[in-house]
Amino acid sequence: MEPQAKRKKEMDDYDDTWEVLPVLSDEQSQDPELLPAYAAPILERRETSRLVKELSLIHPLPNLQHIKRVRPCKHKDSPHPLEVIVCLVSDVQCTDPKKVTLSHLLHTQCFNSNGLGDPFIVQIPANPPLTRPQFEKASKHWPTSFHEDKLVTFALKGQLFTAHQKTKMREYMCVAVKAAKSGRELGMDAVGAVIVDPKTEQIIAVAHDCKRGSHPLHHAVMVCIDLVACGQDGGAYNYEKYPACRFSCSNSVCDGKETGLPYICTGYDLYVTREPCVMCAMALVHSRISRVFYGASTADGAFGSRYKIHCQKDLNHRFEVFKGVMVNACEDLCKE
């Protein structure tokens, strides 16, 4: 008896345990940069206010406004209750920072060091934290202020989108996966893309990779953008020989032909099975896409994996990027 052929996975075989996570800038996602500083124990709590005031005059920290000058002692059995930042290590010239005394740091006879103990070196965050994970890591070194962006916090927890929104995301990505499989049957790379109007929840364009057929630059994202342009009486190419690549005239697009359309992809979302390359990412910038959702990451990806083009401050358009939508199904496309 011949063994039964392995059945290909259908979309219903994939569970819904995936999370939609934001692709943040390096500033938002990197670990806190640390600076060495001198701290000293405050031996008498009643001297705290005076010491902080006088230290701020001798050693102001103008670029470290996020740092709290005083912290409670970490050890409950410590003989001193508080510790205070005296100055940065870089503010004092000394051949051996570990042998520095208060007289080295407080280079003035006007300072009353009563209530201040011997200095020691600590690491303090160089920049204010931008996300809660950064804040939690920074606070392990020294207390810092934090102005939380609630939307970023919800996004990092996978709580930014409602159940209905996630259901629609799955629906759109399933269409992209189906398009990718149609392209693969034609000998193309298995990559699919869908452009959606989030206001109407209607699909505007569907495309798969065509670069091995009509043109070497016809990546799935490029084809999808061009299809939207074609629907706005623009576009540069014809995709009739690829029936899975199509434009759908939504109500907003059809009405817009009479009243004037926004520039190409303004206000639209892109769903793509694989993280776009640099060329496609720049095309998304120029087409004014609103948001990008991708499934599988790639080593040379232009967003989360390597370049983070959507976060470049010198570009004249930026947009939000999310990853992880139907990640298993999208990764299987790469394997197959």
UniProtKB/Swiss-Prot annotation:
Zn(2+) binds at H219, C277, C280. InterPro entries: CMP_dCMP_dom, Cytidine_deaminase-like. The keyword Amino-acid biosynthesis does not apply. One of its GO terms (cellular component) is nucleus. Keywords: Metal-binding, tRNA processing, Zinc. Residues 167-322 form the CMP/dCMP-type deaminase domain. Its cofactor is Zn(2+). Transmembrane segments: none annotated. This is Probable inactive tRNA-specific adenosine deaminase-like protein 3. It comes from the Eukaryota. Belongs to the cytidine and deoxycytidylate deaminase family. ADAT3 subfamily. The gene is adat3. SUPFAM superfamilies: Cytidine deaminase-like (SSF53927). One of its GO terms (molecular function) is catalytic activity. GO terms for biological process: tRNA processing.
